[in-house]
């Protein structure tokens, strides 16, 4: 059997942080997909996992050294506070140290009921498991901090939702699964001792440089805010819409987590919403930075009494820290957008240049991903302008912007060929297009055909490369193929 070198620090925290629970065995598990490179990174034997991984990753066989538990947390869901949520269908097996010396969680999602399941069955359907595998690995390839997919395993038994669906278990790897909602769980109970214990644990695990800070808990809030600002800026750079930015889905580590109703934009529209449960657009594409700050304010509320013994001083420190978030986000976002349009230097007019392009894209219903990818070709040769402009409903509307952009490029130091290569390195050709994800899920769920799943994984693992044989995967959906709504899948 594969050896996992577990060292389970979270399981050594007080008992009110989690519930110990064993996975519920399933009927006939089989391994759909193993992420062999990630297994190697975690110090696991991929060959052995191909043989006996189905038993481990389904929950039928708990590996030696694992201490399975479900984590307690609360959270604001669409702005409404729920004092107890917790892992209702996810079980943390334990922690391993990877090849880079980083501590990583290994969690089974869909492994059975826990004390936090409420009325749920603790199971996952195949479709959401495949979606999370595809999108989390695509995000990693795009360079966006994210939890990872180690394995997808079929359970051999059905789950009952609006219809009967094949069941599966997703094996997730994360820097940790500690969320803003983890702090809220203890704050809701007035348990400041546990908040301090959790904060000390987080500092030791994720932010050890803060241990010697004069105000370590305030520094923790600032550090989490900085990571979230950088993360959400990266989401916007690749057209990603999380869909369910509840406080229980915001990690303290700064990784993207929980891909239930997530999606990528096709035509650029800042108001884009895909999630079926986001009826009022709270988590729309352009709202994500502000929601990030709102969530961080909820984190600050749990920590504020640790900032200073004088209440007014503590509140002022918290507000100042939260105020820095917007500045940090704007810098990350604008720096990234500069790179997307080929700029290395900073000029005051750059924000207007970026915003005017986005306005043209919105008015012209231009594809977000393809616009920036084709702009790289135009940076090298103006003959590519026609193909770029064809993405817009009124192609000629782009011409004045291109003239303005080229005048700005004249003040840049890079040769055109280097600039185009740099732009291609930040503007993907391939993303997990929503219609392609749905096609892959449908083939697997309805026909047990995983070929589209495998093909999509392959293409999106190299998002910045031109892949001439896979041009169809770069294309927007045809009429009738558009995905207008996504679902949580729980």
Swiss-Prot record:
ATP binds at residues 86, 88-89, 109, 121-122, 172, 179, 258. GO terms for molecular function: AMPylase activity; ATP binding; magnesium ion binding. Keywords: ATP-binding, Magnesium, Manganese, Metal-binding, Nucleotide-binding, Nucleotidyltransferase, Transferase. The active site is at 248 (proton acceptor). Its EC number is 2.7.7.-, 2.7.7.108. It catalyses: L-seryl-[protein] + ATP = 3-O-(5'-adenylyl)-L-seryl-[protein] + diphosphate; L-threonyl-[protein] + ATP = 3-O-(5'-adenylyl)-L-threonyl-[protein] + diphosphate; L-tyrosyl-[protein] + ATP = O-(5'-adenylyl)-L-tyrosyl-[protein] + diphosphate; L-histidyl-[protein] + UTP = N(tele)-(5'-uridylyl)-L-histidyl-[protein] + diphosphate. Mg(2+) binds at residues 249, 258. Pfam families: SelO. Its cofactor is Mg(2+); Mn(2+). Nucleotidyltransferase involved in the post-translational modification of proteins. It can catalyze the addition of adenosine monophosphate (AMP) or uridine monophosphate (UMP) to a protein, resulting in modifications known as AMPylation and UMPylation. Belongs to the SELO family. PANTHER family: PROTEIN ADENYLYLTRANSFERASE SELO, MITOCHONDRIAL. This is Protein nucleotidyltransferase YdiU. The gene is ydiU.
């Amino acid at each position: 059997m594969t050896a996992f070198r577990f060292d389970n620090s979270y399981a050594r925290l007080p008992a009110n942080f989690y519930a110990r629970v064993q996975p519920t065995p399933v009927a006939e598990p089989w391994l759909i997909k193993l992420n062999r490179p990630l297994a190697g990174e975690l110090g696991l034997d991929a060959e052995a996992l191909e043989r006996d991984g189905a038993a481990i990753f389904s929950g039928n066989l708990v590996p030696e050294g694992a201490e399975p538990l479900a984590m307690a947390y609360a959270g604001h869901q669409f702005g409404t506070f729920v004092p107890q949520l917790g892992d209702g269908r996810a079980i943390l097996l334990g922690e391993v140290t990877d090849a880079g010396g980083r501590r990583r969680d290994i969690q089974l999602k869909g492994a059975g009921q826990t004390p936090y399941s409420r009325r749920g069955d603790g199971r996952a359907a195949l479709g959401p498991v495949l979606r999370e595998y595809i999108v989390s690995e695509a995000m990693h390839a795009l360079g966006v901090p994210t939890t990872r997919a180690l394995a997808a395993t079929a359970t051999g038994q059905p789950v009952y939702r609006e219809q009967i669906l094949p069941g599966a278990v997703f094996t997730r790897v994360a820097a940790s699964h500690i969320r803003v909602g983890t702090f809220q769980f203890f704050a809701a109970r007035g348990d400041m001792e546990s908040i301090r214990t959790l904060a000390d644990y987080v500092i030791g695990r994720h932010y050890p440089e803060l241990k010697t800070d004069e105000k370590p808990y305030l520094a923790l809030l600032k550090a989490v805010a900085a990571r979230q600002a950088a993360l959400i800026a990266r989401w916007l750079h690749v057209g990603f819409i999380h869909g369910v930015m509840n406080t229980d889905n915001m990690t303290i580590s700064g990784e993207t987590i929980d891909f239930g109703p997530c999606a990528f934009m096709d035509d650029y529209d800042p108001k884009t919403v895909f999630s079926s449960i986001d009826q009022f657009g709270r988590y729309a594409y352009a709202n994500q930075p502000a929601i990030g700050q709102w969530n961080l304010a909820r984190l600050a509320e749990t920590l504020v009494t640790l900032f200073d013994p004088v209440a007014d001083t503590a509140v002022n420190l918290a507000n100042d820290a939260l105020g820095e978030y917007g500045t940090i986000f704007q810098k990350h976002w604008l720096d990234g957008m500069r790179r997307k349009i080929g700029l290395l230097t900073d000029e005051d007019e750059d924000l207007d240049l970026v915003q005017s392009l986005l306005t043209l894209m919105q008015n012209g219903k231009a594809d977000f991903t393809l616009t920036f990818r084709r702009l790289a070709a135009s940076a090298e040769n103006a003959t590519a302008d026609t193909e770029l402009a064809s993405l817009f409903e009124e192609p000629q509307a782009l011409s004045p912007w291109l003239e303005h952009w080229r005048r700005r490029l004249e003040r840049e130091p890079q040769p055109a060929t280097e600039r185009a290569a740099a732009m291609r390195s930040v503007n993907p050709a391939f993303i997990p297009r929503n219609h392609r994800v749905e096609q892959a899920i449908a083939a697997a769920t309805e026909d047990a055909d995983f070929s589209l799943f495998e093909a999509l994984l392959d293409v999106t693992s190299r998002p910045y490369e031109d892949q001439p044989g896979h041009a169809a995967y770069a294309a927007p959906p045809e009429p009738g193929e558009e995905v207008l709504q996504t679902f949580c899948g729980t």
